Amino acid sequence: MATFHFDLVSPEKLAFSGEVDQVDIPGVEGDFGVLAGHAPVVAAIRPGMLTVTAGGTQQKIIVLGGLAEVSEKGLTVLADVATSIEELDRAQFADTIAGMEARLTDKEGSELDKAIERLDHFKSIQSQLNTTAMH
């Protein structure tokens, strides 16, 4: 399988840089996969699980929003936050979700809608983490 260069950058660090076979991205308009030779595109990403496939192995990385750009040079993802599932403190993540739920009562209108949408994304990540832990 043909490979391409992939960089995953967050404000804190260069989370990943290397040649990969495929990257599956949680896009705002729907999840999408990138392979070598993909058409150029810029897409917003939502909080979710990004999957990197390289050399027959998969690495799952949690991203909390950002931007993905596919060009002739490869794929660059600029993530607001990027953490591998191995590095994630699951108890702290659960506490974050509980805090988000508690703060819903302070919001209304479009602010409430956005908070619920973000909470749903976080709960989806938590569900994926629980499923991943069972395999």
Swiss-Prot record:
First-listed, main subcellular location of the protein, grouped into a coarse class: membrane
Any single Gene Ontology cellular-component annotation: plasma membrane
Subcellular location: Cell inner membrane
Cell membrane listed as a keyword: yes
One term of GO molecular function: ATP binding
SUPFAM superfamilies per UniProt: Epsilon subunit of F1F0-ATP synthase N-terminal domain
Record's bilayer topology term: Peripheral membrane protein
Keywords: ATP synthesis, Cell inner membrane, Cell membrane, CF(1), Hydrogen ion transport, Ion transport, Membrane, Transport
A Pfam family annotated for this UniProt entry: ATP-synt_DE_N
Subunit structure: F-type ATPases have 2 components, CF(1) - the catalytic core - and CF(0) - the membrane proton channel. CF(1) has five subunits: alpha(3), beta(3), gamma(1), delta(1), epsilon(1). CF(0) has three main subunits: a, b and c.
Role, per record: Produces ATP from ADP in the presence of a proton gradient across the membrane.
Family named by the database record: Belongs to the ATPase epsilon chain family.
Protein's recorded name: ATP synthase epsilon chain
Species, as recorded: Nitrobacter winogradskyi (strain ATCC 25391 / DSM 10237 / CIP 104748 / NCIMB 11846 / Nb-255)
Designated gene of the protein: atpC
